[in-house]
Amino acid sequence: KFLPKIIKIKKNIDSDFLKKINNKYFDTDGNKENLKFILEVAKILKLKKNSLLRTLKKFKGLKYRQEIIFQSKKLTIINDSKATTFSSSVSLLKSLTNVHWIVGGQAKKGDKFLLSKKNCKNIKAYVFGTKRKFFTSKLKKLMEYESFLDLKSLIKKLLREIKSKKNIRHTTILFSPSAASFDNFKNFEERGKYFNKLIKKYINA
């Protein structure tokens, strides 16, 4: 039987333990926070460190929630279709460098993008969908952007663009729409599945 208890979470994770985990899923600020909580609970439950380490190494998270769907030396592709507001995308954007951010969908009324211009210098936005004017109006003074009618034409152009560049530093394609999916999809799962399908089709085209 477990009684209610307030758990004090450590500010920092042991860097050596983090290296041993060697899982890109825990590289983002949000998932590092989740990992801190996991480690504290593991201590209370007296879980064996080696067993915990094996599990964390293999952990992939839930589908369409900061899901790494492709990784190479030069490119990482993350499917974060679950992100339906600007705030749900910001923490991930702050954690990454050299980001091609795919954004668009049914915008939430009154939604604000609270990221400073300084934190946007390594981000380029690729805006898609019928509501793209809403997104470009919010982002145009903060970062470079391109606008597309649909997700398919965006993916084809973006992948061609990345492949054509030689000697570029590591790049991340982040699909974090910051909007509801109802303009073109039944839900965020269908949207995430469609994104994965497009990447699979055009990544080696």
Predicted regions and their residues:
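A structural signal for short, well-ordered beta-strand elements
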Residues: 45, 144-147, 184
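Phosphate-binding loop of NTP-binding sites
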Residues: 1-2, 155-157, 193-205
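Short active-site-adjacent structural elements
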Residues: 86, 110-111, 134-136, 181-185
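Short, hydrophobic beta-strand segments that form beta-sheet elements in well-ordered domains
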Residues: 1-11, 101, 124-130
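C-terminal helical cap/extension that packs against the catalytic core
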Residues: 29, 110-170
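Flexible active-site lid/hinge loop adjacent to a nucleotide/diphosphate
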Residues: 1-8, 15, 19-22, 183-189
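Nucleotide phosphate-binding/pyrophosphate-handling subdomain across enzymes
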Residues: 24-122
